[in-house]
Amino acid sequence: MRDEIATTVFFVTRLVKKHDKLSKQQIEDFAEKLMTILFETYRSHWHSDCPSKGQAFRCIRINNNQNKDPILERACVESNVDFSHLGLPKEMTIWVDPFEVCCRYGEKNHPFTVASFKGRWEEWELYQQISYAVSRASSDVSSGTSCDEESCSKEPRVIPKVSNPKSIYQVENLKQPFQSWLQIPRKKNVVDGRVGLLGNTYHGSQKHPKCYRPAMHRLDRIL
């Protein structure tokens, strides 16, 4: 649950940063509130033994019928951020499920995987997948094979990690990680160790990018 929620917050925040309407401090405040709210909301609806259970409940959704998702709107209110300044797609759905985070741009398009924790992924591949998902927000959502320069790089990135499993729902334990991970460096050459997506250091081998990964059918939250 910690990895999935941290990934979701990182993904949403990358979209917000791309819109470039909020200051660094505003983004940090919004990210802290969003992570706290997601933990509070999902902790009683998380079923690792049956990931599809509660899927519709764990659905963050924006469309023409509801242009403000309640969870995102609450995070904005509690962080004093204008929802319109997030710059999120007008039609976007994010499913936060055990072992997998999926997204769909447009109500009629197919969902795709943002990050999967089902198998062994190199952590740079997880970042790469999230970066590609972000790039799809401003590109043709029907295309699914190419990667832009940023999404295909293997540069280090860090997603916030809640290190204490006994206190993951306490607000004070969620604040600290956000001070550094939002400071995303631009292109860097990394030869040996890499900083992992969830804060670990490891040595990755050269592999071809996975990029687009279609997801299985998902249950929408009824608006």
From Swiss-Prot:
InterPro entries recorded: Anti_prolifrtn, BTG, BTG-like_sf
Lineage: Eukaryota, Metazoa, Chordata, Craniata, Vertebrata
Record SUPFAM superfamilies: BTG domain-like
Tissue specificity comment: Expressed in oocytes after germinal vesicle breakdown. Expressed in testis and in olfactory epithelium.
PANTHER family: B-CELL TRANSLOCATION GENE, PROTEIN BTG4
Noted disease: Oocyte/zygote/embryo maturation arrest 8: An autosomal recessive infertility disorder due to failure of the fertilized ovum to undergo zygotic cleavage.
Alphabetically ordered keywords of this record: Disease variant
Organism in which the protein naturally occurs: Homo sapiens (Human)
One GO CC annotation: cytoplasm
Signal peptide extent: none
Highest taxon listed in the record's lineage: Eukaryota
Protein name per the record: Protein BTG4
Gene Ontology BP annotations: negative regulation of cell population proliferation; neuron differentiation; regulation of cell cycle
SMART domains found in the cross-reference section: btg1
